[in-house]
Amino acid sequence: MTTYQRSFFCTAASAALFAAMAITSPVYAQSAPSAQLEVQKAASAQKQPLLESLKEFVNIETGSRDMEGILQATELLANKLRALGGQVQFIEPQESTAYRMMDTPEKIGRMVKATFTGTGTKRIMLIAHIDTVYPKGMAAKQPFRIDGDKAYGLGISDDKQGVAMVVHVVAMLKALNFNEFGTLTVLVNADEEISSPGSRAELTKAGGEHDAVLSFEATRTNSDKLSLATSGIASVELKVEGRASHAGAAPERGVNALYELSHQILQMRDLSQNDKGLKLNWTVSQAGTNRNVIPAYATAQADVRVLRVADYDGIEATVREKAKTQLLPDAKVIVKFERRRPPLEATPANRKLAAHAQTIYAELGRKLEVDDQPEGGGTDAAFAALKTQAAVVERFGLQGFGGHTADNEYILLDTVEARLYLAARVVMDISRGKGL
């Protein structure tokens, strides 16, 4: 008998225990039908298997440029999803649809897609990412370990927990013999940390084909919540081409690229509109090769954040128009504007689903916050929402801390069962036409 089968069949003593819990617990005694107790038991049964999966995923290094690790981890994930009955395929990035940016590697990691077919009509998608920000070789500094109420490991919060959550939400549904959805799709990419250059097109396409999308980025340790909005992220790269000359003997023969770059940065320093959540900040610059040479080349980069997809057009047009006003007419100014990630915007659909999720969480006696304002970061949920009016909600993952830190990334163990319960119940209710 498998672990999942053992979790599904309870002894008479166990049944009596849960019946007693239903009577003595104010939440369950007042409102929860027996089906919810079965979901709670299924969530409890999946906690240890989830931690075992999490250990496997964490101990495989999957930096976005580490193709060896990504191949190994995606194969592991595919095998787990096949074992649960999914029709699994690998989706290799296509050059024709990839959005290459200044830091996009030549090779982009593949996606794992699994499809589960049910008896209903609703189409639901669960998404997460398996890549991390860490260079190869750093896992030895933070291997998977459990210490008290925390599980530590490289990439455990961002976003290995999300991958494990998706797997074990599906395992819960299988253990409960629940198949009332029409299609349940799992989509996990391996290039999120480099702005999803190869997977964004598939995420957007798939998002438009589903009635709801649950994204499994972690929530905060100090805030048990779901997110309805994330920031859009863009970058501006300015390149100035001038002409080199001796700085002492013949500076007038040169065209100082640094002067022109400085002029451009200064005339674009006040483009932020904080009341609209639009931010443009110059953060990186480089010019010159030697102290005694007029620089022929200079570059600068700016970080851009927006709250609405429509804001991209306006800020890009402003930057390009400003760049036409030059200090040195003989310099050549080149502007590159990269839309690295769209914003996820709060909509009536995701507000309604999040409100329904709050009622589900309350069945456990827990309060679920819903945040409709972005924190400054961006996620793949925005790509899934880009061409659809369906509900797309972020942060169905565990409570975690320390993403992008090499020595202190962890998840809170006491959130595993509650978050499994929440996600599984949301899938079940959507399948039955509730929450949308």
Question: What is the predicted function of each stretch?
Answer:
Residues 2-15:
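Bacterial N-terminal signal peptides that target proteins for export
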Residues 9, 18-28:
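C-terminal segment of classical bacterial N-terminal signal peptides
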Residues 30-36, 62, 79-85, 218-219, ...:
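Metal-dependent amide/peptide-bond hydrolase catalytic core
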Residues 32-154, 175-176, 180:
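Acidic/His- and Gly-rich active-site-bordering loop/insert found
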Residues 123-125, 151, 211-215, 237, ...:
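Short glycine-aspartate micro-motif
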Residues 131-147, 214, 227-239, 359:
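Acidic-glycine-rich active-site phosphate/pyrophosphate-binding loop
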Residues 148-158, 368-371, 406-407:
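Short pre-catalytic strand/loop immediately N-terminal to key active-site residues, enriched for Gly-Thr
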Residues 152-233, 273, 435-436:
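Acidic/histidine-rich catalytic neighborhood of metal-dependent amide-processing enzymes
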